[in-house]
Structures are given as structure tokens and as C-alpha cells.
Curated annotation (Swiss-Prot):
It comes from Schizosaccharomyces pombe (strain 972 / ATCC 24843) (Fission yeast). It is found in: Cytoplasm; Nucleus. InterPro entries: C-N_Hydrolase (IPR003010), C-N_Hydrolase_sf (IPR036526), Nta1 (IPR039703). This is Protein N-terminal amidase. SUPFAM superfamilies: Carbon-nitrogen hydrolase (SSF56317). One of its GO terms (cellular component) is cytoplasm. Its main location: cytoplasm. The gene is nta1.
Length: 286
């Protein structure tokens, strides 16, 4: 099964311009994307990330029930064109009884353009807290047609909660383990999960980062945060789609990659540099 992760430098608040550049990027990789089954885009892919408050992000919020939802519409067009599942990050608002709640979200779109699931970022980074509400919990879908078990997570979700929880608590990785244990109790035929990480992850060190290479420190850290899965010999596919570039005071690290967790090891099947627009594609047994 073929998977892809998109790495992109969005311009803050320039949604239409970002869509144009993303289409160009997809066109440049159209041959590699043929027969891809799942394509993952970064966190807040069309809007950019570094909004300082709810007022500044207000014009870019999307409601999935609205006719005007650029991120969902773009992902649906991608899914239709490549006949694939698509995951995309976007800033969301929901209305209930006249009250708006804002979320940092990802959406899963089917090859038939169906909106299958929307996930709300559970662990918020400092920038998110200026406008977003914390999601109620992590995400695990036990059986998506053709894909099997899948989990969407967003950036800070794999960190210790609020950077205050014990490092060894490994909240997200242990959540996946518990979900898999439950699925194995229900069925003896559970395929390995696909862990989809949409990111706006910062560089590990502004002073030493080499933009012509992957950010190896971050790559190692992401693997470490999934170590309970590795140490338990859990087989999984990990798709990391991270943005790159500098946005005001934040510098993002790229290094989008495809990893396989198998027999107690993390195997890298493809990785992009810290500073480039690109799509990493890999084919793995599901």
C-alpha cells in the first residue's frame, strides 16, 4: 500500500495563494502519487499556524457543515483526483446554541469525497491556547475501509501534556497500545494501525539546524515519543506531515517522513529535508 506525506511552507492567512502553490506541488509529484492510498497534509495547512488570538484567526475559521470550507473542499478535490484518502489540518469553529467553539482540527476524507471524521487537537501548544479549545481525547478509528485502524494526531499531541506531565507517561503512544489491546480482544484479525501526525513542529535548534538536511534531533524525538509501541513490538505505520519555514517568531522544521514500526525497530522509509516543499512517498505492506 502506498502512502504520502506533504511538506509545505504556507503563507500566513493567504489561503487562495497557498492552494495554488499546493496544486503546483501535487502536479509536480503526480506520477509518484498515482495509486497512493492515503495522503497526509500538515497542521493548519492552508491558513498558516502562528495566529496570536481568536480575532486574528477569525476570518480563516471553517465550519464543516458550511458550503464555504476551503480546507475540506481542497482535500475532497485531492481525494477525487488521486482516488485516495486525504487528511488535512485546518482551524475549525462549531456553533451550538449561539456559542462558537474553536478547534485546531484535522479531517479525514474518503476517495468518494466523504467527510469520515474530524479530530480536535487534544494537547494544545502555547500558540493554540490563544484561540483554540482543547479536544476531548485522542483519536482511533478501528476500521476504515481499505486502511484498517487509523489514528489522527496533531503535533503537540505526542508531547507530554502541557510539557508538565512526566516524560515517561507517553500519553499518546500508550493510548494507541490500549486501543489495539481492546481491538485484539474483539477480533483476532487486527491489521497494524496507521498513525497520521499532521504537524507544525518547530526546529530543534535555530542555531545549528542545517536546512539542507532533515532535522535529525526531531526525527529521533518523534521516535522516542512512540517508544512504548516500539518496545512492545507493536507493528505500525507512521506518517509525519510537517510544515517548514519561518512565520513571525516561529521556525518550523520540515523533516516529513514515513516510518514503519516493526519487531522492536523504527525503520525510516523516506524523509524530506528541513527546508523544502515536497512529498515523501513510500510503499509498505499493510
Amino acid at each position: 500500500m502506498k502512502f504520502g506525506c506533504v511538506q509545505f511552507f504556507p503563507k500566513l492567512g493567504k489561503v487562495n495563494e497557498n492552494i495554488v502553490h499546493l496544486r503546483q506541488l501535487l502536479d509536480q509529484h503526480s506520477e509518484a502519487l498515482q495509486s497512493v492510498k492515503l495522503l497526509v497534509f500538515p497542521e493548519m495547512c492552508l491558513t498558516g499556524y502562528n495566529f496570536k488570538n481568536s480575532e486574528s484567526i477569525q476570518p480563516f475559521l471553517e465550519n464543516v457543515t458550511s458550503n464555504h470550507c476551503p480546507s475540506i473542499q481542497f482535500a475532497q478535490e485531492v481525494s477525487e483526483q488521486y482516488r485516495c484518502y486525504t487528511i488535512i489540518g485546518f482551524p475549525e469553529f462549531q456553533n451550538s446554541n449561539g456559542i462558537s467553539t474553536l478547534y485546531n482540527s484535522t479531517a479525514l476524507i474518503s476517495p468518494k469525497k466523504e467527510l469520515l471524521n474530524v479530530y480536535h487537537k487534544h494537547f494544545l501548544f502555547e500558540t493554540d491556547k490563544s484561540w483554540a479549545t482543547e479536544g476531548k481525547g485522542f483519536s482511533f478509528e478501528p476500521c476504515i475501509p481499505e486502511l484498517g485502524p487509523i489514528s489522527m494526531a496533531i503535533c503537540m499531541d505526542i508531547n507530554p501534556y502541557d510539557f508538565k506531565a512526566p516524560f515517561e507517561k507517553f500519553e499518546y503512544a500508550n493510548f494507541i497500545l490500549r486501543e489495539l489491546e481492546h481491538q485484539q480482544m474483539v477480533s483476532s484479525n487486527v491489521s497494524r494501525p496507521i498513525i497520521c501526525l499532521s504537524m507544525a513542529w518547530l526546529v530543534s535548534d535555530d542555531k545549528v539546524i542545517d536546512a539542507s538536511l532533515p532535522d535529525i534531533k526531531n526525527l529521533h524525538y518523534w521516535t522516542t515519543r512512540l517508544s512504548p509501541l516500539i518496545n512492545s513490538n507493536t507493528d505500525a505505520i507512521v506518517l509525519v506531515a510537517n510544515r517548514w519555514g519561518k512565520e513571525n517568531d516561529l521556525n518550523f522544521s520540515g523533516t516529513s517522513c514515513i516510518m514503519e514500526l516493526s519487531q522492536g525497530r523504527a525503520i525510516l522509509h523516506g524523509v524530506l529535508k528541513a527546508a523544502e516543499n515536497g512529498i515523501v512517498v513510500g510503499e509498505l505492506e499493510k
